[in-house]
């Protein structure tokens, strides 16, 4: 697809002539809103986080659209696409997104991607050397199921508060392909009152020194598989299972 085709999903002249990547003025934001308003129902939202750059690209793959198969929007900063703009996509019914991360991103802990309270199902496919998942799903109030695949690499992940305050979360599925080396997990599953089962048998915790409040407030937790845990270096277990049903 050519660079100038980015906004042709929206048929208006304003959208077709819109400058790419300029989200700092009201006109551009309005055009993006119009594009999202006109997206077909079946979409694939792809967020690419570029190494050492704040600029981010969002590819929206419009499966039911014949003439133009997708749009590319350059975004800086990420806040301009989530929040109310993504809410617009989900007003008709609950959508199922596949999010792809490509490239290491140091800023992931500062960009909570799922502020959208309408999304209830999210699937994450990670095929990069991304390491920092701090607060990635924090305060996702309506998400019920999360599935993570292809977490397999030599690096160690930072997962502090990764699922913190997911008050509706019932299921977290780490795919069989996952091999997770974790370094930080403070408050990782804290305040997930509806979460019943967590399977962490793919986790290597030999580098973890602090597991405090990891399962705080998991009041419905019935099963926790942590058979692979190595806690020889852990020095802080404070509140790890506080207010937890286990």
Segments from the language model and where they lie:
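Register-specific detector for alpha-helical tandem repeat solenoids, activating on a conserved position
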Residues: 33, 134-135, 160-161, 186-187, ...
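Cullin-RING E3 adaptor/co-adaptor recruitment helices
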Residues: 1-105, 111-117, 121-130, 135, ...
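Short, well-ordered alpha-helices that flank and scaffold nucleotide-derived cofactor binding pockets
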Residues: 242
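N-terminal cationic amphipathic segment used for targeting or macromolecule association
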Residues: 13-16, 188, 203, 212, ...
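Structural signature of tandem-repeat unit edges
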Residues: 43-48, 64-68, 120-128, 142-155, ...
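Predominantly recognizes leucine-rich repeat
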Residues: 164, 190, 216-217
